[in-house]
Amino acid sequence: MERVGAATPEGDMPGFLLALQSKSRAEAPRARVQEQDLRQWGLTGIHLRPYQLQGVNWLAQCFHCQNGCILGDEMGLGKTCQTIALFIYLAGRLNDEGPFLILCPLSVLSNWKEEMERFAPGLSCVTYAGDKDKRACLQQDLKQESRFHVLLTTYEICLKDASFLKSFPWSVLVVDEAHRLKNQSSLLHKTLSEFSVVFSLLLTGTPIQNSLQELYSLLSFVEPDLFSKEQVEDFVQRYQDIEKESESASELYKLLQPFLLRRVKAEVATELPRKTEVVIYHGMSALQKKYYKAILMKDLDAFENETAKKVKLQNVLSQLRKCVDHPYLFDGVEPEPFEIGDHLIEASGKLHLLDKLLAFLYSKGHRVLLFSQMTQMLDILQDYLDYRGYSYERVDGSVRGEERHLAIKNFGQQPIFTFLLSTRAGGVGMNLTAADTVIFFDSDFNPQNDLQAAARAHRIGQNKSVKVIRLIGRDTVEEIVYRKAASKLQLTNTIIEGGHFTLGAQKPAADADLQLSEILKFGLDKLLSSEGSTMHEIDLKSILGETEDGHWVSDALPTAEEGSREPEEGKNHMYLFEGKDYSKEPSKEDRESFEQLVNLQKTLLEKTSQEGRLLRNKGSVPIPGLVEGSTKRKRILSPEELEDRRKRRQEAAAKRKRLLEEKRKKKEEAEHKKKMAWWESNNYQSFCLPSEESEPEDGEDESSAQLEYEDPDSTSIRYVSGDVTHPQAGAEDAVIVHCVDDSGRWGRGGLFTALETRSAEPRKRYELAGKMKDLSLGGVLLFPIDDKESRNEGQDLLALIVAQHRDRANVLSGIKMAALEEALKKIFLAAKKRKASVHLPRIGHATKGFNWYGTERLIRKHLASRGIPTYIYYFPRSKAAILHLQASSSSSGQLVS
């Protein structure tokens, strides 16, 4: 190891450099691992590429001579398989059986599990996840049988169950997406630092994002003895001027080498098809310009007051970005009646450009990943795709588990044109190499998130060239946000990959606020020079380049024309410069245009205030355009005109209601179709009963029901003492009823335990239905439970009524009477068809304030009065209770009127 800081006198060295020099004098011999060795020890299902094998050797070397390291390979280069190969090396070569702990985001938990099973089937892997009860069971199992190699869990669960996980002596701790540790004061950083760990491995495709403090936080985690938390200021002070001091830059580069390995696709995956990146600028519609101006004028205090809070300016920035995306993101902007049409496209310069772009890509046979920051914008894009008839899948933060997996599977196996994704939700743990085009509808403030998102398509396994297209609003805040992101992205490239640095000391917060107020003025001179639309047509072929049979032809880059820019040759990152000075400030003309707007707004306010037509609220300014309209005297309408307006509004409201209902039904049908495909792919068969409306009752009507009710012997509820799980039935089938919630988590005690003793089916069927999202309020699962014991005649079945809701905070509602009534109707149909009797416990008897009288009336109305033999069981707690119930059972029919 080359000595770091050798040119600096020892008296002037910070503690971390002295400690590093002392450590470098005693280095362990280098590990030598060949792929055939790994195969002999249990590696299967993969052929490691040369750089991956090199990475495994580097990890093994770090394990021998350090406390930890950072594997910072670019996204898509196989950090997961290198990590698993390290486990195989430790178990096979060193007889180190672990345990190894892996922490990762929930979105990639299943991916880690699948990769472990595929690459290292000889290593036992426990997935530690689920609700509190499930994890409690897992804890008991792990305590009783602690022999496992790998435990896989998420950050959140690790924090919840830290005391349990701390009890294990971990051989290796792996933290995936380790930028979660960039703040050494965070709870996760502090908690994991308390674990007993021999070796820590951090995996991140974005090891440097913003500052030297974040870099030091990662170093202090993997080597706390060398990089103590107290020395962070020394570290920042020593390297804050590395842009000017080449010796400091070289020193930091050498300091990082033993602890951080970073490879990029362009260097090691040369066989990977080329990725080219292009920025296309677009204009704004007149409607967008109107609201862009209005947003800037809405809160003048944020600009005029030097002590303005950053949160106000951030809100203005957020609103401006929404305006550049689409004005319909604001309530009340979309014209009534709400009917989809070309107005959706023409209202936004960005969507107008996307419309032309997707038409071009569709005609050439390309497939697209379409990213946006905002789920509301994804809703508009989804409406647009429906309008144009393009096939699509969608994943955002609300899509979980199996639905997410099914969407990815569908896109990979079917000719679906577009995959809609939110950048944060779709940027991690997804392999979407079926697409060859990535479009960023809008850009993330953090360029690393966009890089991760683009890596969903440009990664190992991609066999086509990939085109990354970014849409930027010309002369808007989007343009300067994009420019600022360009310099931020240089941190990773320069610090890790080049040894040259652009990272200086952080600016004070007040300066950052002032800078933000200036950013919001960017481009105003050109943008507001006219009120009309600045949208224009562009030649997409000349901008994007040649395409043949759904493949991008990347032999040569086209000449960029107005509206677009191609990456400069040799640039290896998402953002690029245009040959201009990318200063972070607006021009002199932009500032003058902003001042003119402010003066105009003040004049307007003073005028309207003097006329008594406006009540001014401090810090609140009306939207320009709406104020002018409010100062005009309205014409008084005649009674006929008022009536005509009322009718038009009624018709518009009815039409809007009808369209919304049609949209809702269409959405439900699409979701149902998607669920059916998911069930089919998992070989799942639902045991839910159909509704009363969907199954005719062979001509039964109210009169026949009334006639049956008049026979007291056949229509009364029969109250019995005993165990409802062993129904007192004759030769007929018996349906046992039990109420559950919609969580899919089987309960403990009482009837839950009694049913589980009777049969293995209830828990299995119920939990599977929960996993497959087959539990909804009012639903009924019906299935036989004669697997352990059965009667000589007749079959026993269990009907699980979903009558309670359990929310994410684990708060359980009471029994919902509407759901119970809906379920009883379904049970009636099933019992009538089977000529079965129905057996119920005293539903809700232990619930305080529960309406048993109302429940009893529902049971009588939908079961007993319609000729279904109905029994309600009182479970005896003592001999006295049995005698009492037996004595009163003969008169039980008179308990309810």
Curated annotation (Swiss-Prot):
Domain of life of the native organism: Eukaryota
Reactions it catalyzes: ATP + H2O = ADP + phosphate + H(+)
Coiled-coil residue spans: 640-677
Region described as Disordered: 558-577, 611-673, 689-713
Chain segments carrying region Regulatory linker segment (RLS): 603-637
Residues the record lists as Phosphoserine modifications: S542, S609, S620, S630, S638, S891
Compositionally skewed regions (Acidic residues) per UniProt: 692-713
Keyword Transmembrane on entry: no
Function: ATP-dependent chromatin remodeler that mediates chromatin-remodeling following DNA damage. Recruited to DNA damage sites through interaction with poly-ADP-ribose: specifically recognizes and binds histones that are poly-ADP-ribosylated on serine residues in response to DNA damage. Poly-ADP-ribose-binding activates the ATP-dependent chromatin remodeler activity, thereby regulating chromatin during DNA repair. Catalyzes nucleosome sliding away from DNA breaks in an ATP-dependent manner. Chromatin remodeling activity promotes PARP2 removal from chromatin.
Similarity remark: Belongs to the SNF2/RAD54 helicase family.
PANTHER family per record: CHROMODOMAIN-HELICASE-DNA-BINDING PROTEIN 1-LIKE
Name of the featured protein: Chromodomain-helicase-DNA-binding protein 1-like
Organism: Bos taurus (Bovine)
